[in-house]
């Protein structure tokens, strides 16, 4: 039941708590976005996750909120990744770039895509997609 899954999240188990939250989200068992965000915060703040697993949870929280979030909220969620050397940094930059592109804020979008293009350890697929977007849609 949903109650059991929430209990597992609150137990702060490094393996089963994230899996419980993802199961709830994937199966749309809870529709309240504020409630889901509080479970993300439990994982991020209270659960002793490996650093890159924690960063993945942060990225998933941003993805979960991206459709409804305002710019400042999305940036606040992603800042720990954007200001790090995490393997998820290029993903976070790409999400922000696409967010601004979808909102027709081309200059901001271009800045984020350029950050990806200039990132040494960027995910190669994301770097390629960023370069394509820059060449195809954002070139002068």
Question: In which residue ranges do the predicted regions lie?
Answer:
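Extracytoplasmic/periplasmic/luminal assembly and interaction segments
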Residues: 1-48
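Soluble extracytoplasmic domains of inner/organellar membrane proteins
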Residues: 28, 39-140
């Amino acid at each position: 039941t949903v109650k059991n899954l929430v209990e597992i999240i609150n137990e702060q188990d490094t393996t089963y708590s994230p899996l419980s939250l993802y199961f709830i989200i994937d199966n749309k068992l809870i529709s309240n976005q504020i409630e889901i965000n509080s479970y993300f915060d439990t994982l991020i703040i209270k659960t002793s996750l490996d650093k890159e697993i924690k960063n993945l949870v942060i990225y998933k929280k941003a993805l979960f909120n991206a459709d409804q979030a305002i710019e400042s909220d999305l940036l606040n969620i992603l800042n720990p990744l954007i200001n790090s050397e995490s393997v998820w940094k290029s993903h976070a930059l790409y999400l922000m770039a696409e967010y601004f592109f979808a909102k027709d804020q081309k200059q901001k979008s271009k800045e984020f895509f350029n950050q990806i293009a200039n990132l040494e350890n960027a995910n190669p697929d994301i770097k390629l997609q960023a370069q394509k977007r820059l060449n195809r849609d954002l070139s002068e």
